[in-house]
């Protein structure tokens, strides 16, 4: 096949990407209406639909290419020509970076993730100089207090596109003004510039106003989550200006935002200033471009191994019965490979484990489940693998290994953010932090349950602690929907000797769970038991879990807050009605 056919193939792939991103924007643009109508089930469906759009369109393009030329894929020289032609289509293309990832996905689908080399794939971007190009149209508007902060805030909020009444706009303006005046020097605040993104960021049951405050030579986040009340009005729930708070809002354990972004690279660069700790991959994922986020994720790994001389090692912590986990001492991610054989007590299959990871990808993670990136045929230099890890790989996952001489290929693995295992964290911290993390752990369980997720194995080793001190679940092999579980009370013993028997005196079905038992394997330490009884004793009662199930079955969708409850304006003690005169003071 000649150069004309290469043009045809390249154009077909790019047109397929155009179709995919057009549908992506179409689903995203419906976020405002779903929010205004408080159609939370439609929000969940749209989230799952948008995630699956990408693979669907990759499949459509692959079928087209097979029709164009059934032999396509067996001539490696020809594939390199197609990539050259495709690269030539990108210099003036507004979403070139994601178009490159789409090309990669089509290639991987055609060639079953084989021969992943830079001449056939965009391992690195073809146009690095354009990554930080000028934005063709402003992504935000500038607002100035001009000695009247409240008036400026009123203008910002009244300019929002939402077609819903405010519950009490003057109260909310007072709360925001008061918070800002307590956070920043008042004189500097009145001379600040507020840059407000043109588009709202939608997720779960909230619409987020995202902005920046330029003050005193510094730039701070300015985030306002907007929620519904029960009467159809809207209100501002809090104001966040701290980098750590903003990082949690855009965190890796949360669902992707719905934000209209025809130029995602421009939005990523705009966000970077208020999320300096976030990598490029995390920013793309946060705005819903998760497949390109995966491309950047891999590039960040390549950058790490290029500049680091560390070897990959077995990850610290208790070894898993289902997963072999490894990392590098200073790398912020871990690699997880499904073992060829599981421990006898694990009644799951490899297929079931992969289904669990897909469920987490598509479900609302409520800030409590780590996002993962799935890779096939992952190649690593043998020299970068420690002897202990190599031995473990050959022992636990030999069926997933392929020897390539000085390299080794792992047929399937996951990569996710590295955290401190909760059980290790609890052994190392002082009393105050121990109490805090027990509170966090219980909150994580409750928030997952409210989102219709039952973790299955609730042992501390299956949870991690982030750099912000949040507890996140990361072991998914026993995960299931809350509505699939039968929560039972333990029946009273028939005879005194029943309690001494090695086997239960009552029947147990596969989906039966007895919350009373949680106390025995979670509270072996008296300090932990005391904190659990103080803050989360309801987790040990079957009635609590059954009540949650009823709420889920009735269609109730819980609110999810990406910040501490004490930060909510509704927790303030001031009187809620204020005159405009006081607001403006």
Swiss-Prot record:
Active site residues per record: 371
Similarity-based family: Belongs to the AceK family.
Subcellular location: Cytoplasm
InterPro entries for this protein: AceK_kinase, AceK_regulatory, Isocitrate_DH_AceK
Taxonomic superkingdom: Bacteria
GO molecular function: [isocitrate dehydrogenase (NADP+)] kinase activity; AMP binding; ATP binding; phosphoprotein phosphatase activity; protein serine/threonine kinase activity
Catalysis: reaction(s): L-seryl-[isocitrate dehydrogenase] + ATP = O-phospho-L-seryl-[isocitrate dehydrogenase] + ADP + H(+)
Official protein name in the record: Isocitrate dehydrogenase kinase/phosphatase
The enzyme's E.C. designation: 2.7.11.5, 3.1.3.-
Binding-site list for ATP: 315-321, 336
Organism lineage string: Bacteria, Pseudomonadati, Pseudomonadota, Gammaproteobacteria, Enterobacterales
Secretion signal, residue range per the UniProt entry: none
GO cellular component annotations of the record: cytoplasm
GO biological process: glucose metabolic process; glyoxylate cycle; tricarboxylic acid cycle
Function: Bifunctional enzyme which can phosphorylate or dephosphorylate isocitrate dehydrogenase (IDH) on a specific serine residue. This is a regulatory mechanism which enables bacteria to bypass the Krebs cycle via the glyoxylate shunt in response to the source of carbon. When bacteria are grown on glucose, IDH is fully active and unphosphorylated, but when grown on acetate or ethanol, the activity of IDH declines drastically concomitant with its phosphorylation.
UniProt KW keywords: ATP-binding, Cytoplasm, Glyoxylate bypass, Hydrolase, Kinase, Nucleotide-binding, Protein phosphatase, Serine/threonine-protein kinase, Transferase, Tricarboxylic acid cycle
């Amino acid at each position: 096949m000649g150069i004309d056919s290469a043009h045809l193939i390249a154009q077909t792939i790019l047109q397929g990407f155009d179709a995919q991103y057009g549908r992506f924007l179409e689903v995203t643009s419906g976020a405002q209406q779903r929010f205004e109508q408080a159609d939370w089930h439609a929000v969940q469906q749209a989230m799952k639909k948008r995630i699956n759009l990408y693979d669907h369109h990759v499949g459509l393009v692959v079928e087209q290419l097979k029709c164009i030329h059934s032999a396509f894929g067996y001539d490696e020289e020809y594939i390199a020509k197609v990539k050259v032609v495709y690269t030539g289509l990108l210099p003036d293309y507004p979403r070139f970076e994601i178009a490159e990832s789409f090309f990669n996905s089509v290639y991987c689908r055609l060639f079953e993730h084989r021969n992943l080399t830079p001449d056939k794939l965009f391992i690195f971007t073809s146009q690095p100089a354009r990554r930080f190009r000028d934005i063709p149209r402003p992504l935000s508007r500038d607002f100035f207090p001009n000695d009247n902060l409240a008036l400026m805030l009123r203008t910002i909020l009244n300019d929002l596109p939402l077609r819903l009444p405010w519950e009490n706009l003057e109260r909310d303006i007072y709360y925001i003004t008061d918070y800002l005046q307590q956070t920043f020097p008042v004189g500097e605040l009145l001379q600040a510039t507020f840059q407000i993104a043109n588009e709202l960021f939608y997720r779960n049951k909230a619409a987020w106003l995202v902005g920046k405050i330029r003050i005193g030579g510094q730039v701070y986040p300015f985030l306002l989550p907007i929620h519904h009340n029960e009467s159809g009005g809207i209100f501002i729930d809090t104001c966040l200006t701290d980098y750590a708070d903003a990082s949690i809002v855009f965190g890796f354990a949360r669902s992707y935002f719905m934000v209209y972004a025809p130029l995602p690279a421009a939005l990523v660069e705009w966000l970077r200033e208020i999320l300096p700790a976030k990598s490029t991959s995390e920013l793309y994922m946060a705005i819903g471009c998760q497949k390109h986020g995966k491309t950047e994720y891999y590039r960040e790994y390549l950058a790490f191994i290029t500049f680091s001389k560390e070897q990959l090692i077995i990850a610290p912590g208790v070894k898993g019965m289902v997963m072999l986990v490894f990392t590098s001492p200073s790398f912020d991610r871990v690699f997880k490979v499904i073992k060829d054989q599981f421990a006898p007590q694990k009644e799951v299959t490899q297929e079931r484990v992969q289904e669990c990871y897909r469920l987490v990808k598509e479900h609302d993670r409520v800030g409590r489940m780590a996002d993962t990136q799935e890779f096939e045929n992952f190649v690593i230099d043998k020299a970068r693998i420690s002897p202990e890890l190599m031995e473990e790989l050959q022992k636990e996952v030999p069926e997933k290994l392929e020897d390539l001489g000085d390299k080794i290929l792992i047929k399937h693995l996951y990569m996710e953010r590295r955290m401190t295992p909760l059980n290790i964290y609890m052994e190392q911290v002082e009393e105050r932090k121990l109490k805090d993390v027990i509170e966090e752990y219980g909150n994580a369980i409750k928030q997952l349950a409210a989102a219709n997720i039952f973790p299955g194995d609730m042992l501390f080793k299956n949870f991690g602690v982030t750099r912000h001190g949040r507890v996140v679940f990361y072991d998914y092999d026993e995960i299931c929907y809350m509505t699939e579980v039968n929560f039972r009370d333990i029946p009273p013993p028939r005879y005194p000797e029943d309690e001494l028997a090695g086997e239960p005196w009552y029947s147990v079905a596969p989906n039966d769970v007895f919350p009373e038992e949680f106390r025995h394997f979670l509270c072996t330490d008296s300090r932990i038991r005391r904190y659990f009884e103080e803050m989360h004793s309801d987790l040990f009662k079957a009635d609590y879990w059954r009540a949650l199930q009823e709420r889920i079955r009735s269609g109730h969708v819980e609110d999810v807050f990406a910040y501490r409850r004490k930060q909510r304006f509704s927790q303030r003690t001031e009187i809620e009605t204020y005159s405009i005169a006081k607001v403006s003071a």
